[in-house]
A protein has these predicted regions:
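Non-catalytic interaction/Regulatory regions outside core domains
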Residues: 1-17, 21-23, 27-116
Length: 116
């Protein structure tokens, strides 16, 4: 698991960290190269929001969500469901390419799904 999260962070310019969390928002494993950022704090709240958003599929005709993007002035958080019980999260600096990060997140998500 750590290998896949490290690969994700290593392949993205401006990556600040990556994490695997369960559907209740609990961080199962995190990789933060700049450990002083403490990115995992508050991540549980994003996990709970993502869980609620994935339930929209049951209430509407939107279809199953594939990913979520939360932007702030200094960073972007990307979340991608790994089935009904897990999410993978990736933080990048706001000034970097979120589309490339989403692409890499999709690739690594396939590998992580085999582990969870």
């Amino acid at each position: 698991m750590e290998e896949h999260l490290n690969r994700l962070v290593d392949h993205i310019d401006g990556a600040l960290g990556a994490a695997l969390l369960n559907a209740d928002g609990v961080v199962v494993h995190a990789v933060e190269p700049g450990k002083n950022l403490r990115l995992t704090h508050g991540l549980s709240e994003f996990g709970l929001v993502a869980k609620q958003l994935t339930s929209l599929d049951e209430l509407s005709d939107l279809g199953e969500p594939l990913s979520f993007k939360f932007d702030s002035s200094d960073r972007t958080l990307l979340l991608r469901p790994l089935g009904p019980k897990y999410f993978v999260a990736l933080w990048i600096k706001a000034t970097h390419d979120a589309l490339r990060a989403q692409f890499q997140l999709r690739i690594v998500s396939a590998d992580l799904m085999a582990l969870v």
